[in-house]
Design a protein with these regions (language model features):
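Ubiquitin-like/PB1-type beta-grasp interaction modules and other compact soluble beta-rich domains
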Residues: 1-63
């Protein structure tokens, strides 16, 4: 699969939530697009990933 343009192996049955935690992201502070579709946060724990998926993860940061 690709995450933000970088190739990455994905374990069988991996979810969006598991991947975000593995990458060190706070699921409450990111937006995730899978194959061109925004995934609602409420679905992160159920949304399964495959080797063919393309993910874009956008992190929100505070500041002024």
């Amino acid at each position: 699969m690709k995450v933000n343009g970088n190739e990455r192996a994905v374990p069988v049955e991996e979810t969006v939530l598991a991947l975000l935690k593995e990458l060190g992201h706070d699921p409450q502070r990111v937006a995730v697009e899978k194959n061109g579709t925004i995934i609602p946060r409420a679905q992160f724990a159920e949304e399964k990933l495959t080797d063919a998926d393309h993910l874009e993860v956008v992190c929100f940061v505070g500041g002024g």
